[in-house]
Amino acid sequence: MNDDIKAKALNIQFLLDYQKDSVVSREVLKKELGTITFFAFDQGKGLSEHSAPFDAFVQVIDGEAEITISGKTHTVSSGEFIIMPANEPHALQAVISPFKMILTMIKSN
């Protein structure tokens, strides 16, 4: 985490830029009990199917994401969120447009 973002009002849209043919991430808070990470996915890019031991809160802040959880695909648009349940396989793709999201993971049972 960078101390340069603490105790400041910042515009999320400008903290992370899209990069051609890439997925870019920036961890903005990391604590023993959880993390907050910003992601920017260029169109056509994504994260392959995986699972995590904790629930994950995904808030799309720009564009539109295709998020598949346990085989069911959801379209999540700017201003919307979805919770990916612990231990369920999930994948994320920028199919229709590039998108930015905030991932919040709380490490608790």
What do the PLM-derived regions correspond to, one by one?
Residues 1-33, 68:
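A short, N-terminal "cap"/entry segment at the start of jelly-roll beta-barrel domains
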Residues 33-34, 43-45, 62-64, 108-109:
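Short, charged/polar surface micro-motifs in flexible loops or helix N-caps
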Residues 35, 64-66, 73, 89, ...:
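Structural motif
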Residues 86-109:
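Ligand-binding loop in jelly-roll beta-barrel domains
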Residues 40-42, 53-67:
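Short, conserved beta-strand element in jelly-roll/cupin
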Residues 22, 36-52:
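Conserved short histidine dyad/triad with adjacent acidic residue
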Residues 71-86:
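Short acidic-glycine-tyrosine-enriched beta hairpin
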